[in-house]
């Protein structure tokens, strides 16, 4: 980590360093939508009308992928995400700078208050901090990210 820092790279995510953060990665960690194209590809799509969030998974085999593609059967590979709060926290807490309260509400469709009791527990354990509507892991929380994420399970 010191060698990367001395070379101008900063850690912006638990497993990523860069001179500037990767926008693709940031979108993923901020629970944004992305389209999976091709054999074995994964995607995440939000249906604006129903407020449902879907994960998509394409068949790994190129032959099976082409069969599905020729049927134009998007629904068969889409699964509704049941626990949006946990999925959001699982992703966003990986970011060193955390996330904004409004982002949580926009991406999950839930009021931020649904997190209150779990945030209180994480704060009591010195794993998370809240500053100006921004939630981020403390240094301890970043070092013990699995334990922090488990609180929101």
Locate the predicted segments by residue.
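Minor-groove-contacting beta-hairpin "wing" of winged helix-turn-helix DNA-binding domains
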Residues: 134-138
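Hydrophobic alpha-helix feature that most strongly marks membrane-spanning transmembrane helices
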Residues: 94-98, 109, 120, 127, ...
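Short secondary-structure transition/capping segments
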Residues: 22-26, 125-128, 143
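Basic amphipathic alpha-helical segments that dock to polyanions
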Residues: 104, 115-125
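A short, conserved structural fragment
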Residues: 13, 123-133
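Short, amphipathic alpha-helical interaction segments positioned at domain boundaries
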Residues: 140-153
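C-terminal scaffold of the Radical SAM
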Residues: 1-110
């Amino acid at each position: 980590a010191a060698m990367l820092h001395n070379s101008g790279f900063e850690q912006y995510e638990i497993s990523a360093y860069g001179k500037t953060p990767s926008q693709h990665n940031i979108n993923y960690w901020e629970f944004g939508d992305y389209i999976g194209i091709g054999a074995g590809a994964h995607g995440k799509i939000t249906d604006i009308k129903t407020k449902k969030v879907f994960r998509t998974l394409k068949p790994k085999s190129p032959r099976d992928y082409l069969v599905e593609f020729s049927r134009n059967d998007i629904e068969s590979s889409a699964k509704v995400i049941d626990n949006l709060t946990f999925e959001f926290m699982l992703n966003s807490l990986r970011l060193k700078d955390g996330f904004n309260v409004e982002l949580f509400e926009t991406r999950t469709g839930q009021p931020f208050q649904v997190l209150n009791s779990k945030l209180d527990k994480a704060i009591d354990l010195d794993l998370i901090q809240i500053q100006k509507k921004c939630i981020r892991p403390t240094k301890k929380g970043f070092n013990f990210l699995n334990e922090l994420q488990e609180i929101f399970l």
